UniProtKB/Swiss-Prot annotation:
It comes from Rattus norvegicus. There is a cross-link at residue 120 (Glycyl lysine isopeptide (Lys-Gly) (interchain with G-Cter in ubiquitin)). This is Histone H2A type 1-F. The lineage of its organism: Eukaryota, Metazoa, Chordata, Craniata, Vertebrata. The modification Citrulline is found at residue 4. The nucleosome is a histone octamer containing two molecules each of H2A, H2B, H3 and H4 assembled in one H3-H4 heterotetramer and two H2A-H2B heterodimers. The octamer wraps approximately 147 bp of DNA. The modification N5-methylglutamine is found at residue 105. Gene3D superfamilies: Histone, subunit A. Residues 1-22 are annotated as: Disordered.
Length: 130
């Protein structure tokens, strides 16, 4: 009976990623590796990369949703850096978070100072009183 290998026993379960266990799209394993290699601390807990991946995924989804709205407002189907810039700068909290960030090819927000706008003239039809 030699040479038959193992008989029976439990079949190994299909590998399940930590991202799928947490219900995330962002890679928990890669975030964990980067936290370990980045010399942020001597040890990294099991929950830290899951939490960080979830935060990064949430922020990305938020920015992409606002950028998609900006693209749709401009009648475009492709998000370009200008749409990202408009999305971030028009949102108060994202603008505060990414205030020191420069987006290449993002342009600036359209803004004209009120004093530079032409004066409002009164209507030409004044009632003539006696």
């Amino acid at each position: 009976m030699s040479g038959r290998g193992k008989q029976g026993g439990k079949a190994r379960a299909k590998a399940k990623t930590r991202s799928s266990r947490a219900g995330l799209q962002f890679p928990v394993g890669r975030v964990h590796r980067l936290l370990r290699k980045g010399n942020y601390s001597e040890r990294v807990g099991a929950g830290a990369p899951v939490y960080l991946a979830a935060v990064l995924e949430y922020l990305t989804a938020e920015i992409l949703e606002l950028a998609a709205n900006a693209a749709r407002d401009n009648k475009k189907t492709r998000i370009i850096p200008r749409h990202l810039q408009l999305a971030i700068r028009n949102d108060e909290e994202l603008n505060k978070l990414l205030g020191r960030v420069t987006i290449a090819q993002g342009g600036v927000l359209p803004n004209i100072q009120a004093v530079l706008l032409p004066k409002k003239t009164e209507s030409h039809h004044k009632p003539k009183g006696k």
